Amino acid sequence: MNHSPIIIALDFPQKEPALTCAKQLSPQHCRLKIGSELFTREGAPLIAQLRELGFEIFLDLKFHDIPNTVAAAVRVAADLGVWMVNVHASGGLAMMQAAKEAATAAKQAPLLTAVTVLTSFDDAALGSVGVDDLMESQVQRLARLAFTAGLDGVVCSAAEVPVIKKSTAPQFLTVTPGIRPQQSAHDDQKRVFTPKEALAQGSDYLVIGRPITRAADPAQALNAIMATL
């Protein structure tokens, strides 16, 4: 069984480099995240190939639509055998409840998580889209909504994990992007933590991309990160 907290973001434009990277990694030491660009190009066959390699897959498509449409999308994701799938919490309570019902009804139910506020956002970015609350208040509101809807957890910055756990439940999962080893570039992330810092905050899963996938030796990079935990 895989007890690793690390989810590696396979942020590649096509399957060849994604599979090359995956084949250098062990499914005992990580899970893989497939995002919008790679899935849009390669679709379900890539999910099947990665699962054949033994990996559990987080399908990171952030569904956000009317409840029936999102429920249908979650059903299809479950049929692909993914380990986790997500929605945008800002889609509202009814949408998330419909998504949860669809996930629960699946033969192999995936974990269902909700994105609170993207880690590329800060208070100014929130204000620019009409959200007057500060980051922490908005994240708490959306996390509580996801918890009320019965979801398994949220995708959030490690900065918000303690308050989310306190306002929901200790077992409510927190999946945290914006994780960078010491000395790594922050790229397009505004709220960044090292893996050790994120776990100290209470994060359950750490999403790490470029520091591993762009390394000369991805397996060595992963092992180096695991050694710091």
Curated annotation (Swiss-Prot):
What PROSITE patterns does the record tag this protein with?
OMPDECASE
Superkingdom of this protein's organism: Bacteria
Q: What is its EC number?
A: 4.1.1.23
| Gene Ontology molecular-function annotations | orotidine-5'-phosphate decarboxylase activity
Indicate yes or no for the key word Transferase: no
One term under GO cellular component: cytosol
Q: What keywords were assigned to this record? A: Decarboxylase, Lyase, Pyrimidine biosynthesis
A Pfam family: OMPdecase
The record's SMART domains line, in alphabetical order, gives: OMPdecase (SM00934)
Q: Which family does it belong to?
A: Belongs to the OMP decarboxylase family. Type 1 subfamily.
Q: What does this protein do?
A: Catalyzes the decarboxylation of orotidine 5'-monophosphate (OMP) to uridine 5'-monophosphate (UMP).
Q: How does it assemble?
A: Homodimer.
Know the name of this protein? Orotidine 5'-phosphate decarboxylase
Annotated source species = Dichelobacter nodosus (strain VCS1703A)
